[in-house]
Amino acid sequence: MKKKPISKLFLYRYRFIIGYTILGLAFALLLIVLPLIAQRGLSDAEIESATSSYYLGKNGILNGDLVDLPYRLLQKYSIVFFGLSAYAIKLPSILIGLLLGFLLILLLNRWFKSNVSLLASTLIVLSTPFLFLAGSGTPLIMLAFWPTLLLWLGSKIQGEKRPKPAYSLLFSLAMLVSIFTPYMIYFALFCVVFVILQPHLRFVVKDLPKLPLALVGSVILAGFVVLGINIVGHPETLMELLFAKGFTIGDFFGNIATGLAPVFSWYSSLEGVFLSPLISLPTLALALIGLFSTTKGFFASRNSIATILLVFGLVITGFNPDAVIFLILPFSILVAHGLKYILEKWYSLFPENPYARISALVPLTILFGLMIIPSLLQYIYGYRYNPSVANEFSDNLTVIRNNLTEGTVVVNENYEFYKILEDKTALTILNEQPQDATELSFLGKPESVPENYRLSRIITSSKRDNSDIIYLYTFTEKLEGE
Protein backbone atom coordinates (compact mmCIF):
# COMPACT_ATOMS: atom_id res chain seq x y z
CA MET A 1 0.00 0.00 0.00
CA LYS A 2 1.37 3.37 -1.04
CA LYS A 3 2.14 5.66 1.87
CA LYS A 4 0.49 9.05 1.93
CA PRO A 5 2.89 11.99 1.89
CA ILE A 6 3.00 13.99 5.10
CA SER A 7 1.29 16.95 3.43
CA LYS A 8 -1.83 14.81 2.83
CA LEU A 9 -2.25 13.62 6.39
CA PHE A 10 -5.26 15.03 8.27
CA LEU A 11 -3.29 16.19 11.32
CA TYR A 12 -0.72 17.91 9.10
CA ARG A 13 -3.25 19.68 6.87
CA TYR A 14 -5.31 20.99 9.77
CA ARG A 15 -2.50 21.36 12.31
CA PHE A 16 -2.90 25.10 12.76
CA ILE A 17 -6.70 24.97 13.06
CA ILE A 18 -6.35 22.20 15.65
CA GLY A 19 -3.58 24.10 17.44
CA TYR A 20 -5.51 27.39 17.61
CA THR A 21 -8.66 25.54 18.74
CA ILE A 22 -6.81 23.80 21.58
CA LEU A 23 -5.10 27.07 22.58
CA GLY A 24 -8.38 28.99 22.50
CA LEU A 25 -10.24 26.40 24.58
CA ALA A 26 -7.39 26.08 27.09
CA PHE A 27 -7.11 29.85 27.40
CA ALA A 28 -10.87 30.36 27.81
CA LEU A 29 -11.06 27.55 30.41
CA LEU A 30 -8.12 29.02 32.30
CA LEU A 31 -9.80 32.42 32.48
CA ILE A 32 -13.09 30.87 33.65
CA VAL A 33 -11.34 29.25 36.62
CA LEU A 34 -9.02 32.24 37.09
CA PRO A 35 -10.90 33.56 40.16
CA LEU A 36 -10.12 30.25 41.89
CA ILE A 37 -6.38 30.34 41.19
CA ALA A 38 -5.76 34.08 40.90
CA GLN A 39 -4.30 36.40 43.49
CA ARG A 40 -5.87 35.44 46.81
CA GLY A 41 -7.60 38.59 47.95
CA LEU A 42 -7.67 42.18 46.78
CA SER A 43 -4.85 44.68 46.51
CA ASP A 44 -5.18 48.30 47.61
CA ALA A 45 -5.41 49.30 43.95
CA GLU A 46 -8.33 46.90 43.38
CA ILE A 47 -10.18 48.23 46.43
CA GLU A 48 -9.64 51.80 45.24
CA SER A 49 -10.75 50.92 41.70
CA ALA A 50 -13.92 49.14 42.87
CA THR A 51 -14.83 52.05 45.16
CA SER A 52 -14.36 54.74 42.51
CA SER A 53 -16.18 52.61 39.91
CA TYR A 54 -19.21 51.91 42.09
CA TYR A 55 -19.72 55.54 43.08
CA LEU A 56 -19.22 56.79 39.52
CA GLY A 57 -22.32 58.78 38.58
CA LYS A 58 -23.61 61.04 35.85
CA ASN A 59 -22.61 64.16 37.76
CA GLY A 60 -19.09 62.84 38.23
CA ILE A 61 -18.67 62.25 34.50
CA LEU A 62 -19.98 65.74 33.68
CA ASN A 63 -17.61 67.19 36.27
CA GLY A 64 -14.52 65.70 34.66
CA ASP A 65 -14.32 62.24 36.26
CA LEU A 66 -13.25 60.66 32.96
CA VAL A 67 -10.03 58.80 33.80
CA ASP A 68 -10.36 55.08 32.95
CA LEU A 69 -14.04 55.71 32.21
CA PRO A 70 -14.72 52.65 29.95
CA TYR A 71 -13.25 50.18 32.45
CA ARG A 72 -14.87 51.80 35.48
CA LEU A 73 -18.30 51.67 33.83
CA LEU A 74 -17.86 47.92 33.23
CA GLN A 75 -16.72 47.39 36.80
CA LYS A 76 -19.56 49.50 38.21
CA TYR A 77 -22.27 47.44 36.51
CA SER A 78 -20.50 44.19 37.37
CA ILE A 79 -20.66 45.12 41.08
CA VAL A 80 -24.24 46.42 40.78
CA PHE A 81 -25.37 43.18 39.14
CA PHE A 82 -23.40 40.61 41.18
CA GLY A 83 -22.87 42.51 44.42
CA LEU A 84 -19.54 43.34 46.01
CA SER A 85 -17.28 40.29 45.72
CA ALA A 86 -13.79 39.51 44.51
CA TYR A 87 -15.32 37.86 41.43
CA ALA A 88 -17.43 40.90 40.52
CA ILE A 89 -14.43 43.20 40.94
CA LYS A 90 -12.21 41.03 38.72
CA LEU A 91 -14.84 40.10 36.12
CA PRO A 92 -14.23 43.09 33.76
CA SER A 93 -10.51 42.25 33.64
CA ILE A 94 -11.27 38.57 32.99
CA LEU A 95 -13.55 39.44 30.05
CA ILE A 96 -11.14 42.03 28.66
CA GLY A 97 -8.27 39.58 29.20
CA LEU A 98 -10.12 36.97 27.15
CA LEU A 99 -10.58 39.49 24.33
CA LEU A 100 -6.99 40.71 24.65
CA GLY A 101 -5.68 37.15 24.35
CA PHE A 102 -7.59 36.55 21.14
CA LEU A 103 -6.53 39.96 19.78
CA LEU A 104 -2.87 39.08 20.41
CA ILE A 105 -3.37 35.80 18.55
CA LEU A 106 -5.04 37.61 15.64
CA LEU A 107 -2.38 40.34 15.56
CA LEU A 108 0.53 37.92 15.50
CA ASN A 109 -1.27 35.84 12.87
CA ARG A 110 -1.51 38.95 10.67
CA TRP A 111 2.21 39.65 10.86
CA PHE A 112 3.75 36.18 11.05
CA LYS A 113 3.24 32.70 9.62
CA SER A 114 0.78 30.46 11.42
CA ASN A 115 3.45 28.26 13.01
CA VAL A 116 5.24 31.26 14.52
CA SER A 117 2.11 33.07 15.68
CA LEU A 118 0.68 29.90 17.29
CA LEU A 119 3.83 29.23 19.31
CA ALA A 120 4.33 32.87 20.32
CA SER A 121 0.65 33.28 21.26
CA THR A 122 0.76 30.18 23.45
CA LEU A 123 3.84 31.44 25.26
CA ILE A 124 2.41 34.92 25.92
CA VAL A 125 -1.23 34.27 26.88
CA LEU A 126 -0.20 31.56 29.37
CA SER A 127 2.54 33.69 30.96
CA THR A 128 2.52 35.05 34.51
CA PRO A 129 2.22 38.77 33.62
CA PHE A 130 -0.66 38.14 31.23
CA LEU A 131 -2.59 36.05 33.75
CA PHE A 132 -1.92 38.68 36.42
CA LEU A 133 -3.46 41.35 34.17
CA ALA A 134 -6.53 39.22 33.49
CA GLY A 135 -6.96 38.46 37.20
CA SER A 136 -6.44 41.96 38.57
CA GLY A 137 -9.53 44.10 39.12
CA THR A 138 -7.87 47.36 38.06
CA PRO A 139 -7.83 49.34 34.78
CA LEU A 140 -4.16 48.40 34.29
CA ILE A 141 -5.15 45.82 31.66
CA MET A 142 -6.38 48.63 29.39
CA LEU A 143 -2.76 49.75 28.89
CA ALA A 144 -2.19 46.55 26.89
CA PHE A 145 -5.71 46.16 25.48
CA TRP A 146 -6.09 49.44 23.58
CA PRO A 147 -2.72 49.35 21.74
CA THR A 148 -3.27 45.70 20.77
CA LEU A 149 -6.75 46.45 19.44
CA LEU A 150 -5.54 49.52 17.53
CA LEU A 151 -2.58 47.65 16.02
CA TRP A 152 -4.81 44.79 14.88
CA LEU A 153 -7.40 47.13 13.37
CA GLY A 154 -4.57 49.11 11.78
CA SER A 155 -3.19 45.93 10.22
CA LYS A 156 -6.64 45.17 8.76
CA ILE A 157 -6.64 48.62 7.15
CA GLN A 158 -3.01 48.56 6.04
CA GLY A 159 -3.07 45.03 4.62
CA GLU A 160 -5.93 45.61 2.19
CA LYS A 161 -5.91 47.46 -1.12
CA ARG A 162 -9.45 48.60 -0.43
CA PRO A 163 -9.98 48.43 3.33
CA LYS A 164 -13.54 48.11 4.53
CA PRO A 165 -14.95 51.37 5.96
CA ALA A 166 -16.14 49.35 8.99
CA TYR A 167 -12.53 48.72 10.08
CA SER A 168 -11.71 52.40 9.71
CA LEU A 169 -14.76 53.34 11.77
CA LEU A 170 -13.88 50.78 14.47
CA PHE A 171 -10.29 52.05 14.52
CA SER A 172 -11.41 55.64 15.02
CA LEU A 173 -13.95 54.69 17.71
CA ALA A 174 -11.35 52.58 19.55
CA MET A 175 -8.85 55.43 19.46
CA LEU A 176 -11.54 57.83 20.67
CA VAL A 177 -12.50 55.67 23.66
CA SER A 178 -8.88 54.79 24.44
CA ILE A 179 -7.88 58.39 25.20
CA PHE A 180 -9.79 58.13 28.51
CA THR A 181 -7.11 55.66 29.65
CA PRO A 182 -3.92 57.27 31.04
CA TYR A 183 -1.07 57.62 28.53
CA MET A 184 -3.21 56.59 25.55
CA ILE A 185 -3.17 60.19 24.32
CA TYR A 186 0.55 59.64 23.84
CA PHE A 187 -0.18 56.41 21.98
CA ALA A 188 -2.64 58.19 19.68
CA LEU A 189 0.00 60.82 18.90
CA PHE A 190 2.58 58.04 18.52
CA CYS A 191 0.37 56.35 15.89
CA VAL A 192 0.07 59.60 13.93
CA VAL A 193 3.82 60.35 14.08
CA PHE A 194 4.72 56.74 13.22
CA VAL A 195 2.51 56.84 10.12
CA ILE A 196 4.05 60.16 9.04
CA LEU A 197 7.65 58.97 9.53
CA GLN A 198 7.25 55.41 8.23
CA PRO A 199 7.60 55.47 4.41
CA HIS A 200 5.52 52.36 3.73
CA LEU A 201 2.64 53.40 5.99
CA ARG A 202 2.72 56.92 4.58
CA PHE A 203 2.30 55.47 1.10
CA VAL A 204 -0.54 53.19 2.29
CA VAL A 205 -2.41 56.09 3.89
CA LYS A 206 -2.09 58.21 0.74
CA ASP A 207 -3.65 55.35 -1.24
CA LEU A 208 -6.57 54.82 1.14
CA PRO A 209 -10.04 55.68 -0.16
CA LYS A 210 -11.32 59.04 1.02
CA LEU A 211 -14.29 57.64 2.96
CA PRO A 212 -12.25 55.63 5.53
CA LEU A 213 -9.89 58.57 6.01
CA ALA A 214 -12.80 60.95 6.53
CA LEU A 215 -14.43 58.58 9.05
CA VAL A 216 -11.25 58.18 11.08
CA GLY A 217 -10.38 61.87 11.02
CA SER A 218 -13.83 63.20 11.90
CA VAL A 219 -14.49 60.77 14.78
CA ILE A 220 -11.05 61.28 16.36
CA LEU A 221 -11.25 65.06 15.97
CA ALA A 222 -14.71 65.14 17.57
CA GLY A 223 -13.45 63.08 20.51
CA PHE A 224 -10.48 65.35 21.15
CA VAL A 225 -12.73 68.42 20.97
CA VAL A 226 -15.10 66.98 23.61
CA LEU A 227 -12.16 65.97 25.82
CA GLY A 228 -10.58 69.40 25.38
CA ILE A 229 -13.76 71.18 26.45
CA ASN A 230 -13.95 69.00 29.55
CA ILE A 231 -10.29 69.58 30.41
CA VAL A 232 -10.70 73.36 30.23
CA GLY A 233 -13.13 73.15 33.14
CA HIS A 234 -11.23 70.40 34.96
CA PRO A 235 -7.47 70.67 34.27
CA GLU A 236 -6.67 67.98 36.87
CA THR A 237 -8.13 65.42 34.44
CA LEU A 238 -5.37 66.20 31.94
CA MET A 239 -2.71 65.65 34.61
CA GLU A 240 -4.03 62.15 35.32
CA LEU A 241 -4.36 61.26 31.63
CA LEU A 242 -0.85 62.44 30.77
CA PHE A 243 1.09 61.56 33.93
CA ALA A 244 -0.05 60.23 37.31
CA LYS A 245 -1.33 61.58 40.60
CA GLY A 246 1.48 63.33 42.45
CA PHE A 247 4.00 62.86 39.62
CA THR A 248 7.00 65.18 39.47
CA ILE A 249 9.72 65.22 36.84
CA GLY A 250 12.26 64.24 39.49
CA ASP A 251 10.46 60.90 39.90
CA PHE A 252 10.88 59.91 36.25
CA PHE A 253 14.09 57.84 36.31
CA GLY A 254 13.35 56.47 39.77
CA ASN A 255 9.98 55.20 38.50
CA ILE A 256 11.70 53.48 35.56
CA ALA A 257 14.11 51.73 37.93
CA THR A 258 11.24 50.69 40.22
CA GLY A 259 9.13 49.46 37.31
CA LEU A 260 11.93 47.43 35.70
CA ALA A 261 13.09 45.88 39.00
CA PRO A 262 10.65 42.90 38.86
CA VAL A 263 11.45 42.35 35.17
CA PHE A 264 15.10 41.53 35.86
CA SER A 265 14.86 40.15 39.41
CA TRP A 266 15.58 36.46 38.71
CA TYR A 267 17.24 35.58 42.00
CA SER A 268 15.29 37.51 44.62
CA SER A 269 11.69 38.27 45.54
CA LEU A 270 10.49 41.87 45.62
CA GLU A 271 7.64 43.32 47.64
CA GLY A 272 4.78 44.42 45.41
CA VAL A 273 1.89 43.10 43.34
CA PHE A 274 4.15 41.83 40.54
CA LEU A 275 5.78 38.42 40.85
CA SER A 276 9.45 38.50 40.01
CA PRO A 277 10.79 37.73 37.56
CA LEU A 278 8.02 39.29 35.51
CA ILE A 279 9.62 37.88 32.35
CA SER A 280 11.46 34.56 32.48
CA LEU A 281 15.03 34.21 31.22
CA PRO A 282 14.10 31.96 28.24
CA THR A 283 11.40 34.43 27.15
CA LEU A 284 13.84 37.32 27.47
CA ALA A 285 16.40 35.38 25.42
CA LEU A 286 13.83 34.79 22.67
CA ALA A 287 12.90 38.49 22.72
CA LEU A 288 16.58 39.52 22.43
CA ILE A 289 17.00 37.17 19.45
CA GLY A 290 13.90 38.78 17.96
CA LEU A 291 15.28 42.27 18.60
CA PHE A 292 18.54 41.30 16.89
CA SER A 293 16.67 39.86 13.90
CA THR A 294 14.71 43.11 13.37
CA THR A 295 17.89 45.12 12.77
CA LYS A 296 17.86 43.71 9.24
CA GLY A 297 15.12 45.60 7.45
CA PHE A 298 14.48 47.77 10.51
CA PHE A 299 12.45 50.34 8.61
CA ALA A 300 9.80 47.82 7.66
CA SER A 301 6.78 48.70 9.83
CA ARG A 302 6.52 45.23 11.39
CA ASN A 303 10.20 45.27 12.39
CA SER A 304 10.43 48.77 13.83
CA ILE A 305 7.10 48.79 15.69
CA ALA A 306 8.31 46.51 18.51
CA THR A 307 11.41 48.62 19.21
CA ILE A 308 9.42 51.84 19.22
CA LEU A 309 6.82 50.27 21.53
CA LEU A 310 9.64 49.32 23.91
CA VAL A 311 10.73 52.96 24.06
CA PHE A 312 7.11 54.05 24.54
CA GLY A 313 6.73 51.53 27.37
CA LEU A 314 9.83 52.87 29.13
CA VAL A 315 8.54 56.44 28.87
CA ILE A 316 5.15 55.69 30.47
CA THR A 317 6.88 53.56 33.12
CA GLY A 318 8.67 56.77 34.08
CA PHE A 319 5.26 58.28 34.84
CA ASN A 320 3.94 55.23 36.71
CA PRO A 321 6.03 52.14 37.65
CA ASP A 322 2.98 49.85 37.26
CA ALA A 323 2.82 50.81 33.56
CA VAL A 324 5.77 48.44 33.00
CA ILE A 325 3.10 45.80 32.34
CA PHE A 326 2.62 47.48 28.92
CA LEU A 327 5.88 45.80 27.85
CA ILE A 328 3.93 42.57 27.41
CA LEU A 329 2.87 43.86 23.96
CA PRO A 330 6.32 44.63 22.45
CA PHE A 331 7.71 41.48 24.09
CA SER A 332 4.97 39.45 22.36
CA ILE A 333 6.06 40.83 18.99
CA LEU A 334 9.77 40.33 19.72
CA VAL A 335 9.19 36.74 20.89
CA ALA A 336 7.42 36.06 17.59
CA HIS A 337 10.38 37.60 15.72
CA GLY A 338 12.76 35.40 17.72
CA LEU A 339 10.80 32.24 16.93
CA LYS A 340 10.61 33.22 13.27
CA TYR A 341 14.38 33.69 13.15
CA ILE A 342 15.10 30.33 14.85
CA LEU A 343 12.67 28.38 12.65
CA GLU A 344 13.97 29.99 9.47
CA LYS A 345 17.54 29.10 10.42
CA TRP A 346 16.50 25.51 11.16
CA TYR A 347 14.54 25.17 7.92
CA SER A 348 17.44 26.61 5.91
CA LEU A 349 19.57 23.67 7.07
CA PHE A 350 17.09 21.18 5.52
CA PRO A 351 15.33 23.02 2.68
CA GLU A 352 14.10 19.84 0.95
CA ASN A 353 13.70 17.39 3.85
CA PRO A 354 10.24 17.58 5.50
CA TYR A 355 11.16 14.90 8.07
CA ALA A 356 14.11 16.94 9.31
CA ARG A 357 11.85 19.97 9.58
CA ILE A 358 9.30 18.06 11.62
CA SER A 359 12.05 16.76 13.91
CA ALA A 360 12.36 20.34 15.22
CA LEU A 361 9.03 19.78 16.98
CA VAL A 362 10.69 17.60 19.63
CA PRO A 363 13.15 20.19 21.02
CA LEU A 364 10.57 22.96 20.53
CA THR A 365 7.98 21.02 22.52
CA ILE A 366 10.47 20.43 25.33
CA LEU A 367 11.55 24.09 25.28
CA PHE A 368 7.99 25.40 25.39
CA GLY A 369 6.98 22.94 28.07
CA LEU A 370 9.89 24.16 30.20
CA MET A 371 8.78 27.77 29.62
CA ILE A 372 4.99 27.52 29.98
CA ILE A 373 4.56 25.01 32.84
CA PRO A 374 6.92 26.80 35.29
CA SER A 375 5.24 30.10 34.42
CA LEU A 376 1.79 28.70 35.23
CA LEU A 377 3.05 27.15 38.47
CA GLN A 378 4.75 30.42 39.41
CA TYR A 379 1.47 32.27 38.95
CA ILE A 380 -0.67 29.76 40.85
CA TYR A 381 1.66 29.22 43.81
CA GLY A 382 3.60 32.48 43.85
CA TYR A 383 0.59 34.65 44.62
CA ARG A 384 -0.46 32.27 47.39
CA TYR A 385 2.79 31.35 49.12
CA ASN A 386 5.36 34.05 48.31
CA PRO A 387 5.04 36.35 51.36
CA SER A 388 6.56 39.35 49.55
CA VAL A 389 3.66 39.28 47.10
CA ALA A 390 0.85 37.48 48.94
CA ASN A 391 0.85 40.04 51.76
CA GLU A 392 -0.04 42.75 49.25
CA PHE A 393 -3.52 41.20 48.95
CA SER A 394 -6.21 41.20 51.63
CA ASP A 395 -8.96 38.56 51.82
CA ASN A 396 -11.10 40.55 54.30
CA LEU A 397 -13.98 40.85 51.83
CA THR A 398 -14.09 37.10 51.15
CA VAL A 399 -13.98 36.30 54.88
CA ILE A 400 -16.88 38.68 55.57
CA ARG A 401 -19.01 37.25 52.76
CA ASN A 402 -18.29 33.64 53.76
CA ASN A 403 -19.02 34.09 57.47
CA LEU A 404 -21.49 36.93 57.95
CA THR A 405 -24.96 37.10 56.43
CA GLU A 406 -26.57 39.73 58.64
CA GLY A 407 -25.83 42.07 61.52
CA THR A 408 -23.67 45.13 62.04
CA VAL A 409 -20.04 45.34 60.99
CA VAL A 410 -17.80 48.17 62.20
CA VAL A 411 -14.86 48.99 59.92
CA ASN A 412 -12.03 51.43 60.58
CA GLU A 413 -10.69 51.72 57.04
CA ASN A 414 -12.05 51.54 53.47
CA TYR A 415 -15.48 52.35 54.86
CA GLU A 416 -16.94 53.43 51.50
CA PHE A 417 -15.74 50.18 49.94
CA TYR A 418 -17.34 47.87 52.52
CA LYS A 419 -20.49 50.04 52.58
CA ILE A 420 -21.28 48.62 49.12
CA LEU A 421 -22.01 45.28 50.82
CA GLU A 422 -25.32 46.68 52.07
CA ASP A 423 -26.80 46.63 48.55
CA LYS A 424 -26.89 42.84 48.13
CA THR A 425 -26.68 41.58 51.73
CA ALA A 426 -28.48 42.06 55.05
CA LEU A 427 -25.33 43.54 56.61
CA THR A 428 -25.13 47.03 58.05
CA ILE A 429 -21.72 48.67 57.66
CA LEU A 430 -20.71 51.43 60.09
CA ASN A 431 -17.51 53.34 60.77
CA GLU A 432 -18.25 53.88 64.46
CA GLN A 433 -19.72 51.80 67.27
CA PRO A 434 -23.53 51.91 67.53
CA GLN A 435 -25.31 52.05 70.89
CA ASP A 436 -28.19 49.62 70.38
CA ALA A 437 -26.92 46.57 68.43
CA THR A 438 -27.38 43.14 70.02
CA GLU A 439 -24.37 41.80 68.15
CA LEU A 440 -21.36 43.66 66.79
CA SER A 441 -18.71 42.49 64.35
CA PHE A 442 -15.44 44.38 64.12
CA LEU A 443 -13.20 44.15 61.08
CA GLY A 444 -9.86 43.93 62.85
CA LYS A 445 -9.24 43.96 66.58
CA PRO A 446 -11.08 46.89 68.22
CA GLU A 447 -9.02 49.38 70.21
CA SER A 448 -11.52 49.26 73.06
CA VAL A 449 -14.16 46.68 74.01
CA PRO A 450 -17.68 48.14 74.00
CA GLU A 451 -19.40 48.32 77.38
CA ASN A 452 -21.80 45.43 78.10
CA TYR A 453 -20.44 43.42 75.15
CA ARG A 454 -18.56 40.16 75.46
CA LEU A 455 -16.37 38.49 72.88
CA SER A 456 -18.26 35.51 71.48
CA ARG A 457 -16.25 34.50 68.42
CA ILE A 458 -13.12 35.28 66.41
CA ILE A 459 -13.19 34.58 62.67
CA THR A 460 -9.76 33.92 61.20
CA SER A 461 -8.14 33.67 57.80
CA SER A 462 -5.51 31.22 56.63
CA LYS A 463 -3.32 34.08 55.42
CA ARG A 464 -0.41 34.41 57.82
CA ASP A 465 -0.43 38.15 58.51
CA ASN A 466 -4.22 38.44 58.57
CA SER A 467 -5.08 35.49 60.79
CA ASP A 468 -7.57 37.33 63.03
CA ILE A 469 -10.01 39.14 60.76
CA ILE A 470 -13.37 39.58 62.50
CA TYR A 471 -14.20 39.92 66.20
CA LEU A 472 -17.83 39.20 67.14
CA TYR A 473 -19.19 40.73 70.34
CA THR A 474 -22.59 39.93 71.85
CA PHE A 475 -24.53 42.36 74.04
CA THR A 476 -25.10 41.14 77.60
CA GLU A 477 -27.04 42.90 80.37
CA LYS A 478 -25.03 43.68 83.48
CA LEU A 479 -25.83 41.26 86.26
CA GLU A 480 -26.66 42.61 89.71
CA GLY A 481 -23.52 42.96 91.78
CA GLU A 482 -21.17 43.25 88.80
What are these regions (language model features)?
Residues 60, 110-112, 148-170, 177-178:
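Membrane-interface transmembrane helices that cradle and orient dolichyl/undecaprenyl
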Residues 134, 303-351:
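Hydrophobic/aromatic-rich transmembrane helices and adjacent perimembrane loops
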Residues 1-33, 192, 198-221:
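Start-transfer (signal-anchor) and selected internal transmembrane alpha helices
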Residues 339-378:
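Signature aromatic-anchored transmembrane alpha helix within multi-pass, membrane-resident enzymes
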Residues 91-111, 149, 288-290:
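Transmembrane-helix motifs of polytopic, lipid-linked glycan transferases
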Residues 49-56, 183-295:
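Transmembrane-lumen/periplasm boundary regions of multi-pass, lipid-linked membrane glycan transferases
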Residues 338, 433-482:
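Aromatic/acidic, Gly/Pro-rich catalytic loop(s) in extracytoplasmic/lumenal soluble domains
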Residues 129-142, 183:
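Short acidic/glycine- and proline-prone juxtamembrane loop motifs at membrane-interface regions
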